[in-house]
Each structure stands twice: as structure tokens, then as C-alpha cells.
Amino acid sequence: MQRDTERAAQLSPSSEDEALVLRQKPLEMPAQEEDSTTLQQWKARQLQRLAEELKAEWQEARLQQVRQAERLYLSHLLDEAAERSMGNDPSVHEQNQRRTAKHTRAKERNRAAFREERGRREEHPRQHPKSRKKAPCSERRSSAKARGPASGEKGKRRRVSSSKDHDGYQGPRVTRRVGVAKLNPFFDGDTDCMEDVQKEFFREGRRPSAKGTHNLRDQSLQGKTTALTQPLLHGPTCKQEAAAQEPPSKYNKNLWHKEIESTFEELFNMNRKLKKHLNLHLEQRLKADQNPDEQQSYSEIRSETFGTPREERTEEVETAEESGSPTEVETTEMWSKVNLKQILSDSEYPRYQQIAKYPLKSESLVPVKAGTSREQDDLLSLSPESGQEPPKSPLLEDESLKPYLQKQADSVASWMALRQKQKAELEQRRQKALLELTEHPNMSLEIHYKAELEEERRARRRMRLALLKSNSTGICALPPDRNNLSLDNGLLDEDKQNQMIRDLQQQILEQNKLHQEFLEKARKRLQEFQKSF
């Protein structure tokens, strides 16, 4: 009984404990209420943040949707404009139809190859159990040779594997289209088609890279030029197809660029050489056109005195070189023509070879007049071109000496006249150059000093006539007379030139004075004008 009472006392709480519990309960109630209020506030804040984030995301999605719609609309408009612009050409329409047909065929082939390869992969582990791997090396090699598929199958396997790998990764354009489809359900069909097309492009683009670089090297330049001359494709899908179907032809491009650079360098070099020779030829022709009388006289003299001895010919050449006669023109012309022929024959291009084949006209000597005598014919027969030596007779030589000497004297006189004429032309050119340099905008020396120039020309003509008369009197002593006359003429020319230079210097000084006076007057007027304002 005592035990029962003790247990009841232990189980029943005392009055003090009950009072403590009752006091603690009202203290715990406000703490729990505060915790619940804080939780509610935190939940409300979280909900508000989520609502704001969702609103921002929704706005961004709407903006992206609008942008994608605008882009698609613009691409559609561009495609329509291109079709309208190129719709009149039936050839372009036919090409587009062919491309679409090829595209569908390639799609079907790729699908069939993928199915076959998938079936083979499923059957492969059944046909070849794992026990084969434990065979020795020789058996393993033989079995590998026996089991080895053909090169075409290997290529297909590689292709399918590459396409399968690419199925996992998609380009940025595809991801964009998928995002548009998520945002707007109207674009679902278009994006699916574009995904299929892009997968096929990846497969077709991987084919040439798997085959190796041999096919790239085998391609010719002709194929490259045709590929470059093809018309541009219209529409975004066609552009993607063209970009995917183009093989990586970096090696061939480098070769092609090198060949083009070498051909252009050769063409430029040939053009420079031809320009040089043409400039020489034109300058010589212009000189010949400026003095046709000199050429005629030179040709007549040469036809008359063609059978002279070698020493006299050398003397005439020396005198011609001193006086700048047309022989220099002929020699330079022949030299330029010979070099031009050599260059054109060395060239590798058939166009220039055809030009070189045409024979350049060789400047033949002026034919002898109809009134030539038998003695002149005999003299012409003595020329080195004839190659025949007629029988020498003393009587004929004595008879032929008199007219020959007379002709020689005439030729020397004509040579002197030509020389004087050339010197006069040179002086005129110098004077013109000096006049152009010292020309005033309102005054020209040619107008003011025309009378003086005419008087100088008349004086020169008189001097020439006097020299010709003095030369015609003495025939035997021609070489010493020629040298003396050339010295006298040189001295006279130098005196005239010095006098002309002095006159020009005086004219320049006068013009400078006039110019300074004009400048002073202009300055004074300027100062007056500035003072007035």
C-alpha cells in the first residue's frame, strides 16, 4: 500500500509544478506568434521577388519573340524580292528546282544509310562474341582482315557517327529557332524543317573532310573558275546549303593565287618592255617626221655615193655623228626593232608570238631616179650587197672619176647645209625654252621681239649661202676645208649664243623691274583701300 501511494505521489504533479507550467504557457504563446509573423513576411517577400523576376523574364521573352518575328518577316520579304527580281529568268528557276530535287534525294539517301548502319550495329555484337577477343595476335589480325568492311562502308560509318555526334550539338541558329518555337507556337513547323535541313548539311559537309586531301589536290583550276562564276543563291536556306557544301579548298586556293600572281608579273614585265621600245620607236618617228627633207636628201646622197671606198664612208659616218644626222635615227630604229623581235620571240604567250610573227617593215633605201646613168649602175654594182666584182678597166675609172668628184662636192655641200639647219633648229628650241621660262602672264617675248628673231634668221641664211659658195669653189681640199669651216661655224655660233643670252638676261631684268613696279602699285592701292575702310 505504501508503494502504491508513493507511485501515485510521483505520477501526480504537485501544485507548484502546475503553477509553473501555467505561467510558462502565456510566455511561449507570443514567441510563437512572432515566429509565425516573420515567416509570413519572408514568404511574402520571396513571392514578390519571384513575381518581379517572372515579370522581367516574361518581358524579355516578349521582346525576343518580337525581334525574331521581325527577322523572319524581313528574311521572308527579302526572299520574295529576290524571287521577283530573278523570276523572269527561266534558267534560275530551273536551277532552283534542280537544287531542291538534289536536296530531297540526298535527304533520302542519308536516311537510308543511317537505317542500314543502325541495323548493322544492332546485329554486330550477335555475330561477333567476346570470346574472339581472347584469340592470339595472328588470329586477331586475320579475323580483323576477314571482318573488315569495305572502304565505302567505313566512310558511311564515319559519316553517320559524325552526324550522330552533331545531333547532340546544334549551332547558334538552331538554338535561336528553338527558342522562338518555345516563345511562339506558330513557328514550330518551320523550326523542325530547319533542324532537319541543318542536320543534313552537317552530314554532307563532313563527307569531303573524311575522304582526305587527295580529292582536294585532284581538283582542277577549271572547276574552281566554274564554281566561282556560278550565280549567287537566294534565301537563307540556300545560303546555308552552299556554305555547307563548299569543300575546304585552302590548298587549291593558294596554288591558284600563286599562278595568277606569276602570270600578272610576267604580263607587267612584258608591258614595261614593250612600252620602252614603243616610246623609242615613236620618238624616232617623230624626229623623222619633223625633218622629211633631210631624210630625202640623205637617201639621195647615199644612193649616189653607195659605191665609194670604205675610208670615205667612215669619214661620212663620223661627220654625221658630229652633226646629229638621220643615220643615228636609222641605227637606233634598227636596234630597237631587233631587240623588240628578240623580246617577243622569248615571250611565252601566243598573242605576243603572233605579233612577233608579222615581219616589221625594213626601211629600204630610196630608189635611184629613172635618169641615172650607166656609170651610177656600175658604182652600185661595186656595193658589198651585190657580192659581184666587175672587171676593172683604167679607162672606165678615169671617165667615172669626174662625175663622182662633182657629186661628192654636191653631197658635202648638202651635208653642210643640213648641219647648219640642225644647229639653227637647236638654237630655236633653246630660245623657245628660255622664252617659256621667262614668259610673263600679260607679255610674251615672241610677240615683242619677233622682228629681231626674223633678222637673225635672215643673217644666218646669208652666212650659209656664203659658206656654200666658198665650199663649191674648192673640190680637192675638201677634208681640211670642212674641219676649218666647222671650227669657224662653231665660233660664230658661240658668239651668237652669248649675245642671245645677254639679250635675254636684259629682257629678264626689265621684266623683273616691271613686275616689281606692278607689285608696288598694287600694295599702295591695297593700303589706300584698307585706310578707306
From Swiss-Prot:
Paired cysteines (S-S): none
Tissue-by-tissue expression: Expressed in mature spermatozoa (at protein level). Detected in retina, lung and kidney. In brain, highly expressed in brain-stem, cerebral cortex and thalamus with lesser expression in cerebellum and hippocampus.
Chief subcellular location: other
ATP-binding is among the record's keywords: no
Induction: Expression is moderately up-regulated 2 days after intracranial injury and increases at 4 and 7 days post-injury.
Keywords (A to Z) from UniProt: Cell projection, Cilium, Coiled coil
Coiled-coil residue spans: 40-72, 416-531
Chain residue ranges for the region called Disordered: 1-40, 84-176, 286-333, 370-399
Cellular compartments per GO CC: motile cilium
Record localization: Cell projection, Cilium
Composition skew (Basic and acidic residues), residue ranges: 107-126
Stated name of the protein: CEP295 N-terminal-like protein
